Amino acid sequence: MQLMLFNLFSPALKLNTGLAILSPGAFEVHSDGIDVDNELFHYPIKKAYTPYNIHTYKTEEVVNQMNIKVKNMTLDEINNTYCNNDYYNQAIREEPIDLLDRSFSSSSWPF
């Protein structure tokens, strides 16, 4: 429920694929995480906080392969690049928000 409310009342775009993408200007990247609307989300995945989505999990392997950068991309570019290909199925799954434990393993996926 908290995840749904965030997607409805925030600067994130909810795509029909289930991928919530931050709109440009909605975040600031810091050395210890991503600040979204003054709320800090921590990513203990090297320094690969490619600021594209704070509410989905990706494996480290796919993050490194894709080197995702969407801050200046249009919604169509994001859809065409990240949502209409094989990477989507292997990389992106939504999970509940948990600020204390950020796990990036596929075993944490709810499916």
UniProtKB/Swiss-Prot annotation:
Superkingdom is Bacteria
Name of the featured protein: Putative protein YddJ
